[in-house]
UniProtKB/Swiss-Prot annotation:
It comes from Lactococcus lactis subsp. lactis (strain IL1403) (Streptococcus lactis). The active site is at 209, 242, 326, 329, 352, 363 (o-(3'-phospho-dna)-tyrosine intermediate). InterPro entries: CB (IPR044068), DNA_brk_join_enz (IPR011010), Integrase-like_cat_sf (IPR013762), Integrase_catalytic (IPR002104), Integrase_recombinase_N (IPR010998), Integrase_SAM-like_N (IPR004107), Phage_Integrase (IPR050808). Residues 170-376 form the Tyr recombinase domain. The keyword Electron transport does not apply. This is Prophage ps2 probable integrase. Residues 63-142 form the Core-binding (CB) domain.
Length: 382
């Protein structure tokens, strides 16, 4: 222990100790009014008490990784939607199954995490989610002072080499305009799929997600202003018939977008159909939603996806792509990119955060293909 005189006439007592977590020397101090032998004994006792407290707090380094991971998961689930919980549960389980149940969190180094990444035998998308999950687990551990730094941040995913197959995957994420026209025409040709056709065409023009589209209510539709508020999504986990609207996927998903002439026509038609159904069907379930079945229940994603696949199978030349509701959103992105709309404007319309990986990939792919048209234009000039 040593003592320093302070300008205010008091005395500061210091003592060093070795932090068991970092193995570095640290110091603690107390300030007293006197420098007498009695005061020095008091200071010594207080310093030892402080050191003991610091060392006990450092013992959190003995905590097991899986215990902290479970603790984080219980905490994190309270801040995300049920749909996000379902999406992340598989990655979380993948991590828990890999790591030894007895390993201390302080012993999970960047090398250990890198080995987890290198050993992982799973699709790239799952590996990326698992790495993001590890980042969050260790950020939590740092915040609660279980560890001093996040080892997951230094571990790296292998650089993805883009192949011809990857480029084909991007192309398969959206429809060409002739493909869109053929599919919509088939859906419109049958009375039992007309409502689905209206929804599909609306998404191809608006760029909204299906969950956002079926969560649209009449009060969101500002016809006189030619705008619509996309301020939520339908929580499918509780059932479509309950029609529970929840917050959107991200803050950027909370948006108001302008409506084209055709979008207004679509909204007017579906609302008119709903009013007709309400007048003739006794058990019509009025929940205020726009894109609903003839009984008032929001259109279901699984039924929609099945219907467009069946419609595709009836085409003379079926589209060789994985058709789902999301393809209409991506089709708008590609169409706007082809028409030289800036990426920022597209992102704002479709409500993607930070550009959005898929949005950017489609935009880049389409604009790269457009470079070939430059030569055609220049050749025509001559």
């Amino acid at each position: 222990m040593w003592i320093e005189n302070l300008p205010n006439g008091k005395y500061k007592y210091f003592e060093r100790y070795r932090d068991p977590l970092t193995e570095k020397l640290k110091k603690v101090s107390v300030t007293l009014d006197k420098k007498t032998p009695r005061a020095q004994k008091v200071a010594q006792a207080e310093l030892l008490e402080k050191i003991e407290s610091k060392i006990n707090n450092s013992s959190t380094s003995n905590a097991k990784f899986t215990d902290i991971a479970e603790e984080w998961w219980s905490f994190y689930k309270k801040s995300i939607k049920q749909s996000s919980i379902s999406a992340l549960q598989s990655s979380f389980n993948f991590i828990i199954d890999y790591f030894d149940k007895e390993i201390k969190i302080s012993n999970v180094t960047s090398k250990v995490i890198q080995k987890f990444i290198n050993d992982a035998d799973c699709p790239r998308s799952k590996l990326e989610r698992s790495k993001s999950t590890l980042n969050l687990i260790f950020d939590y551990a740092v915040d609660l002072e279980y560890i001093e730094y996040n080892p997951a941040r230094k571990a790296k995913l292998p650089k993805k080499i883009q192949t011809v197959k990857d480029l084909e995957k991007i192309q398969n994420k959206y429809l060409e305009q002739n493909e869109l026209k053929a599919l919509l025409s088939e859906l419109y040709s049958r009375p039992n799929t007309r409502r689905l056709a209206l929804l599909a065409e609306f998404m191809s023009l608006n760029g909204c997600r299906m969950g956002e589209a079926i969560a649209l209510k009449k009060e969101n539709y500002k016809r006189s202003e030619r705008k619509i508020d996309i301020h939520g999504t339908l929580d499918k986990t509780v059932g479509y018939s309950k029609g529970v609207k929840t917050t959107p996927k991200t803050a950027s998903s909370f948006r108001t977008v302008d409506l084209s002439d055709r979008e207004i026509e679509i909204l007017d038609e579906i609302i008119e159909q709903n009013n007709l159904s309400k007048s003739v069907i006794n058990d019509y379930n009025e929940m205020g939603y726009i894109f609903v079945s003839k009984r008032g229940i929001p259109l279901q994603t699984n039924s929609f996806n099945l219907a467009i696949k069946r419609a595709n199978s009836r085409l003379k030349s079926p589209i060789n792509k994985n058709l789902s509701s999301h393809i209409f959103r991506h089709t708008l992105i590609s169409y706007l990119a082809e028409n030289n709309v800036p990426l920022k404007a597209i992102v704002d319309r479709v409500g993607h955060k930070d550009g959005g990986k898929t949005t950017t990939a489609i935009y880049t792919h389409v604009t790269e293909n457009m470079k070939s048209s430059i030569i055609d234009i220049l050749n025509k000039k001559n």
